[in-house]
């Protein structure tokens, strides 16, 4: 980040739960060029426990909602009026997981409840369809993980057995985002220190 960018805003003025995403979105809306750097190396520390991971992802989910509420209209305007690809890219980054995830959960639960009440004999076939959808989602996450693993194999620093094992557990990890997204709508979420590796 250029110093001039920070000075333009009069210092760091980004304090939502995902301040890095907020900063990026604000710059895109203001017309700054944000780009992909193929050779960039990201050093990321991971939470030590699943509970800490849950807390971190709860904060991220709530932060994405905050950013969507604050900047969503401007991003949509940039996408559909100015045809700005960067606005589209960030819209797809911040909105789909929460909106599609919550819509999917609510729709499936309501659908199963209505079927159970109005047509109990169709509950098993309906549950079977939902099960197939869940399996399809699992396979989608598996394929995304596989593509990532193949393209970044040498940059993932763990033994090959663990890499392969993670292909099968990654979709399960991603499934835990569904209750996190729902919880982020109702639970008061604040920033707190997360121990990392």
Where in the sequence are the language-model features?
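Select subsegments of transmembrane alpha-helices in polytopic membrane proteins
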Residues: 96-104, 137-139
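DHp/HisKA dimerization-phosphoacceptor four-helix bundle of two-component histidine kinases
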Residues: 59, 97, 170-173
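Juxtamembrane C-terminal module of membrane proteins
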Residues: 73-90, 113-197
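Non-transmembrane catalytic domains and loops of membrane-associated enzymes and transporters
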Residues: 1-83, 95
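Alpha-helix/helix-capping structural signal
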Residues: 4, 40, 112-113, 180
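Internal, well-ordered alpha-helical scaffold/interface segments
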Residues: 89, 93-97
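Amphipathic, well-ordered alpha-helical segments in soluble domains
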Residues: 67, 108, 178-181
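Hydrophobic, aromatic-rich transmembrane alpha-helices
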Residues: 101-119
């Amino acid at each position: 980040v250029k110093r001039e960018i920070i000075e333009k805003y009069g210092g760091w003025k980004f304090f939502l739960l995902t301040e890095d995403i907020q900063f990026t979105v604000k710059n895109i809306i203001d017309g700054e060029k944000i780009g992909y750097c193929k050779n960039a190396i990201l050093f990321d520390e991971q939470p030590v426990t699943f509970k800490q991971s849950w807390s971190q992802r709860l904060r991220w989910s709530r932060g994405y909602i905050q950013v969507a509420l604050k900047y969503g209209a401007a991003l949509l305007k940039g996408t559909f009026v100015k045809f700005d690809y960067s606005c589209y890219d960030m819209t797809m980054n911040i909105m789909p997981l929460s909106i599609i995830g919550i819509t999917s959960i609510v729709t499936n639960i309501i659908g199963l409840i209505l079927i159970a009440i109005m047509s109990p004999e169709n509950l098993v076939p309906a549950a079977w369809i939902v099960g197939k959808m869940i399996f399809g989602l699992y396979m989608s996450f598996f394929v995304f993980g596989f593509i990532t693993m193949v393209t970044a194999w040498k940059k993932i620093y763990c033994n090959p057995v663990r890499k392969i094992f993670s292909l099968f557990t990654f979709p399960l990890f991603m499934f835990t985002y569904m209750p996190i997204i729902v919880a982020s709508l109702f639970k008061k979420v604040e920033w707190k220190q997360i121990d990392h590796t």
